[in-house]
Amino acid sequence: MGKTKLFFRKPPLDLHGITHLEVQALVEDYVLLNQAYLPLQIITGNSQGMKNRVIKCLKEHGFAYQIGDAFNKGYVAVLKD
């Protein structure tokens, strides 16, 4: 059986055009302010460096995550535990 399709209730955080230095603060603000609406979507594009920074931030705050889906690996989903 395949993965369940995620339904996002909040608009995504789109990191296109954002520098790697800005990621930590933006991700923290977005996730902590919207954690009642999990799952959330953070659009990273294909940059592995951007994904790594997002994942590091999520791990620091104890959030579960999933990297994209079968058709699109350009985002990180922040999940309920």
Residue ranges of predicted features:
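Long, charged, low-complexity intrinsically disordered regions
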Residues: 1-81
